Amino acid sequence: MTVRRATIEDAKEIFAIEMDCFSVPWSLDSIETELMNQEKKLYYVIEDTEGVVGYAGAWLVYDEGQITNIAIRPSARRQGFGATLTRALIEECFKRGMHEIFLEVRISNLSALSLYRQLGFTVKGMRKNYYSEPKEDAYIMSLIKEERK
């Protein structure tokens, strides 16, 4: 299992993961745009022996990180890829001076909620009807650098 910074060459693999994981995936153009300008953005991929199995990204805004996506191929879930990838993203955000990291998660995504809580995230609020297809609320979660586990 290897975590590394994503490059533009990873765009098609990331797009394939988006298609596998999300009901409303980002377009290939959007992914390429994100990967081309990583000064205020961080994108990582995680690989196994067969290639990229997941990716995660965050936007860096002043002293806050906003996790945009964390996605692991369905066939690679429950093997530690998500935790390893998310920890790497968190560490880099804090290394770059972020004080707090935010994310949104479907209230029904119990696996992700469990992982985020294990990593020290806490629920700060809710966004009504944040997701579409299916329509669902999102929890807003955050991790403060000084309070992390």
Spans of model-derived segments:
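Active-site acidic-Proline motif in GNAT/NAT acetyltransferases
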Residues: 73-79, 107-109
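Extreme N-terminal starter segment of soluble prokaryotic enzymes
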Residues: 1-3
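Conserved hydrophobic beta-strand within the GNAT/NAT acetyltransferase core sheet
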Residues: 67, 101-105
